[in-house]
UniProtKB/Swiss-Prot annotation:
The keyword Cell inner membrane applies. NCBIfam families: ispZ, PRK00259.1-3. GO terms for cellular component: plasma membrane. HAMAP family: YciB (MF_00189). It comes from Coxiella burnetii (strain RSA 493 / Nine Mile phase I). The lineage of its organism: Bacteria, Pseudomonadati, Pseudomonadota, Gammaproteobacteria, Legionellales. Its main location: membrane. This is Inner membrane-spanning protein YciB. The chain crosses the membrane at residues 8-28, 53-73, 76-96, 121-141, 149-169. Keywords: Cell inner membrane, Cell membrane, Membrane, Transmembrane, Transmembrane helix.
Length: 181
């Protein structure tokens, strides 16, 4: 369910684009992203960092897209967000006792330190590559192809990557804790 909630602004963007074009889709994504952050706050009394970072950039680059009537700004948004995640993940190797992925999953899984490090680096590399792929599609294909890639391409790539990570974790897990929070 959380996965659908996380992808809801992208799905709304996609539907709005198919019916009304890039500018209405951009405005819709801005509104839905703000609603997403608000709903999460109302339900859990805290902010999900991923949602807030995405909201900041959708509002900033979405505004530029609408004011300057140029879709390149909104097309760059995924790359900027992906690269921020990559930098934060990579940087977590040097700041703090544990990597970011370790901090996020340590309550559920016990892994050797080297495995946590590899997982963290693989996520950083994944986000770096997603950012590059987004730019490749932006500059080599039309807007319709980019919108389809943004929803379906990144979704499939993310699911395949998560599946690969699950196999890697299962192979190296010392103790799986079945807490669901």
């Amino acid at each position: 369910m959380k996965f659908l909630f996380d992808y809801f602004p992208i799905i709304c963007f996609f539907v709005a684009y198919k019916f009304w074009g890039i500018y209405i889709a951009t405005a819709a994504a801005m509104v839905v992203s703000a609603l997403q952050v608000a709903i999460y706050w109302i339900r859990f009394r805290r902010f999900e960092k991923f949602h807030v970072i995405t909201l900041i950039f959708i509002l900033l680059l979405g505004s530029f897209t609408l004011v300057f009537h140029n879709a390149i700004f909104i097309k760059w948004k995924p790359t900027i967000v992906y690269w921020i995640f990559a930098i934060v993940l990579f940087g977590s190797h040097f700041f703090g006792k544990h990597t970011l992925v370790h901090r996020m999953l340590k309550e559920k899984i016990e892994l050797p330190a080297k495995t946590w490090s590899r997982l963290n680096l693989s996520w950083a590399l994944f986000f770096l590559i997603l950012g590059v792929l987004n730019l490749f599609v932006v500059y080599n294909f039309d807007t319709n192809t980019w919108v389809n890639f943004k929803l379906f391409g990144t979704l499939v790539l993310t699911l395949v990557f998560i599946l690969g990570q699950a196999f890697y974790i299962a192979r190296h897990a010392q103790n799986l804790k079945m807490n669901s929070r």
